[in-house]
Amino acid sequence: MRTFKTVLFSFVFSCLSAQENITLNIKDDGFRSIWYYIGKTNDEYTHKYSGGLGTYPANHYPFSVYSAEANKTFFCYGGASKDPKPSLLHEVAYFDHKTKTVSRPTIVMDKKTDDAHDNPVISIDNEGYIWIFSTSHGVNRPSYIHKSVKPFDIEKFELVKPTYLKDGQIKPFDNFSYLQIYHDDENGFFGFMTHYDTGVLKNGKSKPRRTSSFITSKDGVSWSELQDIGQVQEGHYQSSGAVRMQNGKLKLVSIFNYHPDTEKGAGLDYRANIYYLQTTDFGKTWQNYKDELVLLPLKEVNNAALVLDTQKDKKLAYINDIEFDAKGNEMFSFISSFGPEPGPKNGPYELKTGYFNGKDWNFTKVTEVDHNYDFGTIYHQKNSWSLLAPTNNTPYQYNTGGELELWKYSDKKQEWTLSQPITKNSKKNHSYPRRPIHYHSDFQAFWADGHPRQFSDANLYFSNNKGEVFPLPYQFTGEHFKIQKK
């Protein structure tokens, strides 16, 4: 008969083995983005949104970080296994700016889903260690954190066993959604994230509230308590940014909408309004754009953080990206429409920007797109603004993505004009171009393509500051691949 100690040892060993088996550290032989869809529509557009979504969603950031010390851009993405029904692989690779080569990607883990909401994000600490944060879509799957064994090295990652404080007790930090992670040499990690709360809504006790929050950690292992930013009705989707101000302080900004508490359906389908909050002391205090102190969490629709009321015009607000000028003033991009379903009936789909000039917000239309998820990313270089987005609505209209185009902003005219096409004559739609942290001129955007109306292979790409596009090889041999312009 087995003793209690033997049984206990076997149980503990099996748990440890299961944890260790999560970490794969396997080399892949190419770059394959996950293909994903949500919401069948039973019409020609087939899905609410779909395609190659290896760098989705807008609320995950960053997917890539440039290191001047290593002279490499490290990037992660939602990869696809080679199974008939591909599983989501969390993969990491780098582009070497000296040799102009990309490494073979390392498969850190298999997320055991095809849900692109579980896509990873990446960070590099002040010692050069690479961190991969494996997010989750809600509470049905766990989240993970991995750290490279060596600085600036992707050969081997080890599983971190993080904890956080909850009600004064130390708990496993094993679930986080919609993570945007930033690292500060002095204070460590700052994460904007979402957690799901049930039983708190007026309409539908089983429906979750997507609660916007933040969390911090000095070392990536021991994390603070979750501190809620917004608890308005059914919750929020937030995007964020960070900038080093001229006074040396790190400013962290959250831009978010709110989801109405609806009697039928999901409030996220009626996301509206745009709110702004900032902190310059790593989350100790928060202010609105007027530098007025705001107490958290926000609980009312009309609150001190509101900068744009889209609900009064019955318009939705899909927030994209945020970037800063040399003074630390922000610009964010968003798409407004009249409904969640794809197709012309909910148009016009207007891609817009909001810029804070130090006193007021200026809202400007960039152009019309054809889908709520036509994400665009913003750049500020040499005192000028530009925006990269799938604004050419081909080859598949009224679906996620399209052909990428670069737009330039004129301060004098206060308007956007088309600068140049980035992708052309594509067979699949390109979507979710993402800006790296500390981006280098050779690697300024990273994205995937995919057929939006049926399952397909999905390729990954990056582009430079000249608008030249470099496909990442779907399959290759050797440890490195010399990139070639498309």
Regions found by a protein language model. Name each.
Residues M1-N21:
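Bacterial Sec-dependent N-terminal signal peptides
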Residues E20-K486:
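Extracellular, repeat-based ectodomains that mediate carbohydrate processing or recognition
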